[in-house]
Amino acid sequence: APSRGLGDVYKRQIQVYYASLSNEEDKVDAIYHFLKQGFRYGARVLDMHGLVQVCRVYELYRSVSNENQKYRGFVRFAEIGRQGRKILLARIRPKNQLLPLLGQHFADRFGQENFAIIDDERAMGYFHGETAFLSKVDMAQIDRLWQGQRDTAYEELFQTFFRSIAIKERENYVCQRTMCPIRYRDYMVEFSGGKADEETQMAGGRLQMVENRTESMGTGTKQMGSHKIQGEHKA
């Protein structure tokens, strides 16, 4: 079969790289078996979705890619430090290891800025200045900086803006939670305290009640369907 070109090779490398950033325990085995199939079939392995190994790597890739895409829009930077020695600091708590991806994304956009992105779950940070690097961090020190040296003036302005553009009659917390799940909101300034956060928490509680009720109704429907089928068999 003719070669499918560098594009497919690059695509395969991207999928494997993203899969390696997954938090799933089986990622190493999945990548190993995927590569074995790749050496056997070549670039066309990417289209062989009937192979379990190919499907699993694609699932891992898609999970990391989707979470990375969301965090690109949900990362919020705060100004940290004293006058003349300030940096932009963002904190995240992702399921997967996103620092290499997010770091490069924001380095391309804030090339002249000194910034850091901290992954609270892994106690790691991506630091960008004259050079860029990943490093383990002391979370106690990060907490002290976050609480004691964060400039909140712009945060308060953004919270005011967030509330002022809202249209009361069009508020839809179910849709909001779908588009911006609660697990992403820990360090999103528009949800960190104040009226917006209180309303969101109340809405989250109401939504959970609806979900529980829907789940109970679904269980009841399944049981009724099961009894009906059994009755038909007896008849």
Model-found features: residue ranges?
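Post-transcriptional modification and biogenesis factors for structured RNAs
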Residues: A1, K222, I229, A235
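Single conserved hydrophobic/aromatic residue that forms the stacking wall/gate
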Residues: A1-Y10
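Charged, compositionally biased non-catalytic regions
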Residues: I14-E67, F74
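Internal, well-folded beta-alpha domain core
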Residues: D47-V137
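Long, compositionally biased intrinsically disordered terminal regions
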Residues: N114, Y126, Q149-E215
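C-terminal active-site/capping subdomain that shapes the small-molecule cofactor and substrate pocket
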Residues: K136-D138, R144-L145, T152
